[in-house]
């Protein structure tokens, strides 16, 4: 995915599910989740092993969310990503972001075939911060 294709994904998304979130300080999933909340996104933590993260209810899976999120950000090992994408397809999520360092060609193809916008092996925090620096996205995500 090219940089110009990333901007609309971030601008059009208001609700974001973070799959594989950790409640441990310093973990990338928690840092990214906090950053996204601080920039105006409504974030839904997803991890079947946690009941809450940073005073926010945590959901066991995508189908348990109270809304269909605009975007799912995945922090899972590559072998788990296809199952997350299958669930996202089943719940009609329109956009998938497979976080930096995670590569699953199977999941990427699956998302594309389902008509989803998909980003893989890029950090959503870094990409958002770059667009803020460039003045292309407002800091508060209006």
Sequence positions of predicted segments:
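Mid-chain, well-packed structural core segment of small domains
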Residues: 62, 66-102
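Short N-terminal or domain-adjacent regulatory/targeting segments
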Residues: 1-12
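A short helix->loop->beta-strand "cap" motif at the edges of active sites that frequently abuts
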Residues: 39-41, 91-96, 114-116
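Rossmann-fold NAD(P)-binding glycine/threonine-rich loop
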Residues: 100-126
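Conserved beta-strand elements of the Class I
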Residues: 17-19
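NAD(P)-binding Rossmann-fold cofactor-contacting core
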Residues: 22-27, 34-54
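A charged, well-structured terminal subsegment
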Residues: 127-142
């Amino acid at each position: 995915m090219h940089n110009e294709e990333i901007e609309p994904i971030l601008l059009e998304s208001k609700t974001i599910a973070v799959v594989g979130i950790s409640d441990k300080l310093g973990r990338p999933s928690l840092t990214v989740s906090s950053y996204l909340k601080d920039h105006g996104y409504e974030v839904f933590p997803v991890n079947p092993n946690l009941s809450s993260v940073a005073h926010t209810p945590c959901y066991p899976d995508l189908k348990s969310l109270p809304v269909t999120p605009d975007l799912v950000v995945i922090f899972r090992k590559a072998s788990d990503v296809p199952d997350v994408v299958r669930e996202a397809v089943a719940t009609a999520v329109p956009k998938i972001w497979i976080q930096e360092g995670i590569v699953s060609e199977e999941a990427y193809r699956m998302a594309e075939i389902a008509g989803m916008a998909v980003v893989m092996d890029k950090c959503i925090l870094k990409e958002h911060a770059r667009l803020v620096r460039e003045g292309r996205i407002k800091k508060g995500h209006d």
